[in-house]
Each structure stands twice: as C-alpha cells, then as structure tokens.
Amino acid sequence: MLFTSTAVAALSGALLIQPALAAPNGLPSHGGSHHGPKDPFEVLDPQNWVNPDNMTWADFKSPPGTKWNDPSRKGSIRNFNIALVNVDYPDKPFTITMAPGSDVFKNPQPGSPNVTRSQVPAFYRDFLNKPGKLNRGHTLHEYWMEDSNGRFGVDLTTFGVYKMPLKSYQYGIGESMNAGACPIGETCYYEIRDDALGAWRKDIGEEKAKSFELVFILSAGQDESSTWQEFGEIMFQNKEDVTSAFGPPPGNGTGNMTLPNYAKTRYVEWTSWASASAIWPNAGDGSSTQAESSGMGTFAHELSHLLNVGDNYNNPYGKPLRRSYTGPWSMMSRGSFNGPGGPHTRWQVPPLQGGSMGSQHTFHDKIRLGLTTKDSALNISREALANSGLIVARVTARVIAPKPGDLIGIHVAMDKDKSPKCDVNTDPYCDGNGYQNYNVEVIDRMGADSFCPDSGVMLSKTRDKAFSNYQWTIDANPQDIKQVDFHRPDGTPAMISLGDYRQLADALFHAGTRSGSQYEYTDKANNLQFYIIEPHRDEAGVLSYTTAVRYVGGKDPHKRGVKLDKNAKITSSNTKPTDKGVTCSFTLHNTGTYNPAAGKAKHPQDVTAYLKSDVYRLKATVEGRGWRVEVPNALATAEFGKTVTVSVAVGAENSAQDKAKVTLTATSEADPSKFATAECKVNKFRN
C-alpha cells in the first residue's frame, strides 16, 4: 500500500484570501461565571474559526510551562534514531543552493540562506531538528515530544549529498499516477529508495546503516503533492495552456518534444509536466521520501506511517466525491498541511508556511501509537451505559500533558454500529458505516494545534483495526462552508469542493447557545447523546470542557430529582434591562440519589466517579411586552446532593412594560419527568 501525504495547493498570487468568520484567536471565553457577565447576553463559547489562508506565525502559542524543543531533553521512552539521506540528480541540484527565485517554481524564496552543496546535509538537519532563527525554534523533536507528552523524541543524523545515477524525473514519474509522462526513449518509474539507500549504505557500511531505526530520504527539488494544483489548474486555464517552461526537457534526438507540457496526476486529470515529474512523498519498509518543499508536517506524517498507522484522508476531487474524514484536526488526515498561510503555500522552499507545523495526532491515534497513557482516557461501553446511567467528565485539550486524574479523551465502545446503511458512491456525507467507537476530545489552538482552524470539542467515530478511513469527524456544521479556494487565470472563482478538508474548519462543537456551532449531538440509531456543557480556561491558559454522554432509552438506575430555589436574584450590578440587560441567577439543586449498583455495570474500567451527576436542560420564558430572555447555556450539570447557579439573561426595550416575570424550567435529561420551575421578577428601571 502506498502511504502518501497529499495536498490541495495553489499559487498565493491566484488566491482569494478569505476573512475569518469571527475573532482570530479561536479561543472560547471563560465559562462558569455565576455572577452575570458585563453583557448578560454575551455568547458563552463563540465559534471563532479561522481560514488557514489567513494564519500567520502570530497564531502560534506555546503550551503553558513547556519547552518541548529543548534538544537536551530526550524522550522518556525512546528517541527515534533517524538517518537523513540527502540526494540530488544530474539534472536537478538542491533548490536551496540556487539563487532566490531562479527555478521554474520561483524558488528558493526571497531571503533564503546561501547554501552550498556541501552544506546541504547540515542545513536540512538543522532546519528540521535544531532550534534556530529560520525555523523559529520549531523542530521535529519538539513536535513529537509535545505530541507524546515527553515520551518520544527525535535524533536526526545527516548524510550525503549523494548524486543519483538517473535524472530526477526517472524517479519522480509514477507508472500509474503519471502514466504517459516519461520522455520518449527514456525509462522511468525507478524506485528512489534503491539508489538512495544503496549509495548511503555503500558510504557508511551495512553495520552502521543497521543502527538507524528509520531513514528520511530528502530529494532535491519539489514534491508533486505540494505543486500539482498550484502549477496546474491554478496557473493555467487549460492543460493546453501549460508553457514549455513547465514542460518536459527539450528533445535530444529521442523525440521528447512530442510529449505535451502537461501530464496526468493523482487527483485530477492533469497538471504541468514539471509538477508531475516530481516525487510524491510516501513511506514504507522503514524509510520515507520527502523533497525540499516538504514541511515538517510531511515528515511527521510519514514518520507516523513508519510506526504503522495509515492515512485517513480522501480525494477532495474524487468521483464519486466524499467528504473529508478528519480534515485539519488529524496529522494522518489534512492536519499535515497546517501552518501559517494555509495549504496554498506548501510549494515554497524552504517550507516555512503551509505544512510547516502539522496538527497533533487525534486522541484515537495517540492511544494507538502510545503517545499518551491509558490513564488519560476514559473508556466506557455503550451497552454498559444503558445500565449505569449517564457519565459526566471534564476533558482537557489534547495538546496539554495530562496531570494525574486528567482526561484528554473519552472512548465509547459499541458492540455494533447501528447506523442506517449509506452508500459512499452516491452520498458524499456517508461515513462508510461499520465503526466500533465514538471519541470525545478537546482541541485548542496552541502548540502543534496552533494552526488548527478552531478551538472546541471534536466528536468522531473510529474503527479499531482499519488501516485507512478509520476515523470520521462529526461535523457540527455539515452544510457547505462556501469559501472561494482560488481564482483561475480568467478570473473565475473556484470554490472549495465538498471533499476539501477545509469544509471541516467549522466542525468543532461548542458549549452554550448562539455559538455558531452545536452544544449536543444525538445518534438515535446508536442510542447515544453527547453534551458539551461548559468550557473552562484556567489561569495558566489550559482549556478543558465539561462533557457528558448518555444512553438514549436505557433504564436509568438512579433516583433523579431537581429543585430550583424560589428566590432568584438579579446579579448584574452595572447595567439595566434597557441597557445591556441583567442576569437572573437561579440556584439549582440535584435532589436525586446515587445507586451504587450502577458501578457494577460492565464498563472497560471503573467509572464510578463519573456516574454521580445529572445533566439538566434549561428553558426560559418571559411575561411582559417588550421583554426578551436568553439562557447563555441551555445545559447544566450538578452532582447528586450538590447545587449550582444557573443564569438567564433578561433585556427590555425602552418602550417595554415596566415589569416582567421570568420563568426558568430545569429538566433532568436522564429522567424528563423530573423538572422544576422558578421565577425571577424584574423592573426595567432597576438592576
């Protein structure tokens, strides 16, 4: 099987830069205020997704209290001992050794360092794995240390440069991907590993070569993954418009001039020959191939393959078309494209923008690869949930190293996926059926996740043993995101396809009402309901969410109950109903009792501590002409025997009646027959 890191790229000059839909930081506001915010109607947890094209290095934020790029700190379990084998060709030197903008792709970029061929091995070793000015201190070692909470690091030893015996395109042109592109009279489809690894082993000896766990082959020039679109349909209106500069080499008596300037490529019918003739990054048998345009996200993605985890992405232009699987949220999906400037800058050398900082691995992949401890996962069973009652748990952002007792994910195992069958050939939103689990995880825009489009909660379905298409993000906003991808040469806008990974930029769930996202998700067929109850961001800046999972239709073992105190208070002190509004604060009591028998339900682990709460749905009404109400959060949770404060925002027009009565109803989600009501009286002239 070919494992590849793929791209949807475009020339920056041809792009329509899209505005972010909200504030650029993507960070939810502090939740849980019980004293009324300055604006009682303020949205608790707004969805502030950001278009990757608009991101800059200013979006990067270090996880609090960390210095994962410290080269003196090694992985507590292992440091990957990796050889970096640098190779160039008779027809293609390393781009970084050339004058700025001098190759056909206008690389290297202005301001690039002046590097000689003999300096190439050290340059790319340092660029990839030594904190410095050019890479802004970001390294492969940093990525894996952060992603694994200090368990795995990277040691990189560099070799070469080795001159390959054949021309670059004889290795780069693939037999199936680029059929018909080999210059007439020449032979292509050669495996770069044979000559690259052969030269390396001959140089250092078999015994020393065997001392390395893995090998990165770094090929001079571009990779096809990062150039096929931008130097294809983005630059040229039609394939016949591709200029000779991007075509095959001039004829030398072998008839090469009969080849067109375009060629077949992986995802669409054509690209320029110059793009098609480059290698496509891939991994297998202990080695991976990359090129100079391959960012650190590509190296991290290919290293993941070498650890025996597969791709989880689609063809964004496939026929039939399918939605992206996990999009920008997963290193094994299009998260490998993440970085400032978005995917359309991945063609640049050196790779300092798109693809330079891929996302973290998902919670599913972290468990699979041993990047986190099992203690940081809450493992529950859907079937046991029917007998134990709902579970409430606080989940911390996956970028944060969990402390003892902290969770970075919830894993809900199912004995069978009961979802109705769907057909991937006719429905682009079909998940393919046959999943074994649901996962809940929190993503925050810091560390390697800084260039994810949003902060919030990701729900996904996963398969245990599948090697590809094994995880499917539940999209909180499944509608077409309707963003322009680029402009064609004639000025026609090309929209992001339904299969484009950026369709999932607004997929995360958020707490509270009016967020632009959703705060709950129900899978009726699988009898599961998920709740996003409240966001929390502590003084250090760590993001977490209180979440809950309930079996729909089970026999709840607990006695449920709820009470609202009658003396609701107006807790806003600096505003009036006719200004920003006021807050009515209600005291909610969980009057239910816990049944110890629930702890005997056969979950994969002891979940007793998470069974001792209920979730309540809040609804508010108001009596009075010209008045309005809103519950900033339609959900609340409280442990058995405990109380919490819940809020209702109340506002009035200047012409409203002088007084109004607000009624709040709180209903148990576990047992809707248990509910309580209380009133709050307000006067538009007083706060």
Curated annotation (Swiss-Prot):
Its EC number is 3.4.24.-. It comes from Arthroderma benhamiae (strain ATCC MYA-4681 / CBS 112371) (Trichophyton mentagrophytes). Coiled coil: none annotated. GO terms for cellular component: extracellular region. Its main location: secreted. This is Putative secreted metallopeptidase. Keywords: Glycoprotein, Hydrolase, Metalloprotease, Protease, Secreted, Signal. One of its GO terms (biological process) is proteolysis. Residues 1-22 form the signal peptide. Glycans are attached at N54, N114, N252, N256, N379. It comes from the Eukaryota. SUPFAM superfamilies: Metalloproteases ('zincins'), catalytic domain. Belongs to the peptidase M10B family. InterPro entries: Peptidase_M6-like_domain. GO terms for molecular function: metallopeptidase activity. It is an enzyme of class 3 (hydrolase).
